[in-house]
Regions:
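Short charge-dense sequence patches
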Residues: 41, 49-62, 90-99, 169-174, ...
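Intrinsically disordered, low-complexity segments enriched in small/flexible residues
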Residues: 1-74, 78-83, 93, 239, ...
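Cleft-lining beta-strand/loop regions that shape enzyme active-site pockets
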Residues: 55, 64-150, 156-161, 166
Length: 353
């Protein structure tokens, strides 16, 4: 029997250079791929919230175009990460830039216009953190991609194939069918970032601890209803790893395409919105739990010692000001009987003395 892999081991696989990449999938499973630059009526521009025009350029970490999947025209949005240390800078270290998300948004519109099923492949550390992407409104573009996928009037399939990092991954994952390769991760933050925030240091131990907290594996995602199914994937050292994984991907995409083709788009939209609404929802407690909780609360209130300090002073205030007689007072705005401001206050707390 194979030993169950830890989250740390799965994360190592998800970030490995020899993990399957989007370009390999497109070359093996699709035919007649045409990049967005070759589409005659594809407009790489967007209107910003302030009314200005955003001109978009090629993002090396994003593959966008149209192709055929088993004879059917589809639109493709795929994130590409480096396959070697030498490719790291060429692919922006696996970080998708604002231009990539802008082009993805344009491709979503294109797919809806021509009734193309949208296939997205997610593999990114996260959104690009540099100033150039911020200047092109990357956070707004990521949010727009998420909203657009939820309202898209064409069928969509999303597959996480490596790293699903932060909002940059969510932007392409809100599809009618959502899958994940077994040796992939999906999380709100990279474990290194989580470790730096929670533990103030990034080591093997803190990364492993962060992964246990984040619970980013495919099994966790199925458990929480964030994906629909896991696509089987052999160990990376398997000599037939690539061929076996491609076969599994092809089978799942074929099955999903057949399912979606027979469903009405309105029903798919409602189903997707219901799935998203259920994410993170905790089951209602059983009646026996409620009764036990009420009993324990009454018992605790009966047995707890009397509070000798002012009950209106929060614990945090006592911690800051101590238990002296100098009760902290808030410097609030003072108004007269008619509601006119007599004295402006900052709201900060000061000792009464």
């Amino acid at each position: 029997m194979l030993r169950k892999m830890t989250a740390r081991e799965i994360y190592r696989c998800a970030t490995a250079y020899h993990k399957i990449k989007s370009r390999q999938i497109i070359e093996a499973l699709y035919t007649d791929f045409t990049s967005w630059e070759g589409l005659l009526d594809f407009a790489p521009t967007l209107r910003a919230p302030n009314g200005s025009t955003i001109s978009l350029t090629k993002d090396p970490a994003m593959i966008i175009g149209v192709a055929q999947f088993q004879g059917t025209d589809v639109a493709i949005i795929a994130q590409q990460t480096p396959q070697s240390a030498q490719e790291r800078s060429a692919y922006n270290y696996g970080l998708t830039q604002a231009d990539g998300y802008g082009l993805a948004l344009c491709m979503m519109d294109y797919a809806e216009k021509y009734g193309l099923t949208l296939h997205t492949f997610i593999d990114t550390v996260g959104g690009d953190p540099f100033a150039a992407s911020a200047a092109k409104l990357q956070s707004w573009l990521i949010a727009r991609c998420q909203a657009r996928m939820l309202s898209l009037q064409t069928r969509s399939i999303a597959t996480i194939i490596g790293q699903g990092g932060s909002g940059g991954a969510i932007a392409l994952q809100l599809a009618h069918r959502r899958y994940m390769l077994a040796l992939s991760t999906y999380s709100v933050i990279a474990p290194e970032g989580c470790a730096a925030i929670l533990f103030r240091q990034v080591t093997e131990d803190t990364i492993a601890a962060a992964l246990e907290i984040l619970q980013p594996t495919a099994e966790h995602m199925v458990q929480y209803g964030i994906i629909d199914a896991i696509i089987a994937e052999p160990p990376l050292e398997d000599p037939h790893y690539l061929a076996t994984t491609l076969d599994s991907l092809s089978a799942m995409l074929t099955r999903a395409t057949t399912e979606l083709a027979s469903a009405a788009i309105d029903a798919l939209q409602q189903e997707l919105q219901d799935k998203i609404a259920r994410c993170g929802r905790i089951a209602e407690p059983q009646p026996w739990y409620r009764r036990g909780r009420r009993f324990a609360k009454r018992l605790w209130n009966f047995s707890r010692p009397a509070v000798t300090t002012d009950p209106h002073i929060a614990d945090i205030r006592r911690h800051v000001f101590g238990n002296s007689d100098c009760t902290p007072q808030a410097c609030n705005t003072v108004k007269d009987a008619d509601g006119n401001v007599v004295r402006h206050g900052c709201g900060h707390l000061f000792p009464a003395e």
